Amino acid sequence: MTHVFEVYPKVNVFLKILHKEGAYHKIISRMCLVKNKLKDIISVKNALSFSLKGDFDCPLEENSLFKALQVLKKFLVQKNFSHSVIKSLDTLAIEVEKNIPTQAGLGGGSADAGGLLYHLNQMFDWRLSLKELYTMGSLVGADTNFFISQYKSANATSYGEVIENFEEESLEDRLEIYAPNHVFCSTKAVYQAYKPETCFFQAKEWLKKTSLECLKTYDRNELNDLLKPALRTNPALKDIESQLSKEWFFSGSGSAFFRLKNTQKGANETHCQQ
C-alpha cells in the first residue's frame, strides 16, 4: 500500500493581534490555500520499520510530522484503539519532497502535519471526526488545523487553531507567492518584537470581509500586524520589503509575500529569489 498526496501552502490575507493571553497572543486571521507550483509531495507506505525521509531543517523530534504521529498514537491509545492499529504507525515509511520553505509564513511544517493526520484517517478508515482531528492538530501547531480542515478559505481565531470555513470566491489559483531565498523569520522572535499600537475592537468586522475586499482595500501594513516587528528583527527582510510595490502583501510572521496574480498571459506564478 502506497498513498501519495500533495500539500499546498497557505497565506494570511489578514492577521490581527487581539491581546496576549498566557505565553501566546490571541489572533484573528483569514487563511487561504494557494495552489500553484509550490507544494510538498508526501508518500506513505507500509514497511518493516518506521522511517521519515525528507530535506528537513530540524532534528527528528522537532519535526512536525513526527510530532503529529506521537500525538496521534497517544490519542488512539486514549480512544482504546487496538494494539495492532497503534503498532501499525511504527511501520510507516514516510517520504517528503519538500518544496514549501520553512520560516516563511506559509505554514510549511503545519501543512505537512495537517495533511498527514487528515490522510491517515482516510487511509485507515478510522472515522475520527473533524473535531477529534482538530484536538490533535492543536497540539502539533497553531496552523495545523487549517490544513486538516481541507478548506480553501477559513477564519482562524483564538491562537489560530479554531477554524471556521469562510464561504467566498476561491483565491487558491489567483494568488502568487514570493518566498525570498535565505531569508527566514523566527515566529517566536517576531511575536516578541510585536508592540501593540492601538486597542483592537473590530475583530468581528474583519471576519466578515471577503479576502478580495481586504486585498483591494488595505495595504500590507494594515492587513498584517506582524509586518512591522518582522522588519525590525530582520534587516535582510527590510531591504526586500522596501523594494516591493504596494500590490504585495505579507503572510504570517514572514518571510514570504503574496499578491493577486496578473491575469495577463505570461504572468509568473511563484518566485524564489535571492
UniProtKB/Swiss-Prot annotation:
InterPro entries: GHMP_kinase_C_sf, GHMP_kinase_N_dom, IspE, Ribosomal_Su5_D2-typ_SF, Ribsml_uS5_D2-typ_fold_subgr. This is 4-diphosphocytidyl-2-C-methyl-D-erythritol kinase. Pathway: Isoprenoid biosynthesis; isopentenyl diphosphate biosynthesis via DXP pathway; isopentenyl diphosphate from 1-deoxy-D-xylulose 5-phosphate: step 3/6. GO terms for biological process: isopentenyl diphosphate biosynthetic process, methylerythritol 4-phosphate pathway; terpenoid biosynthetic process. The active site is at K10, D143. It comes from the Bacteria. It catalyses: 4-CDP-2-C-methyl-D-erythritol + ATP = 4-CDP-2-C-methyl-D-erythritol 2-phosphate + ADP + H(+). It comes from Helicobacter pylori (strain J99 / ATCC 700824) (Campylobacter pylori J99).
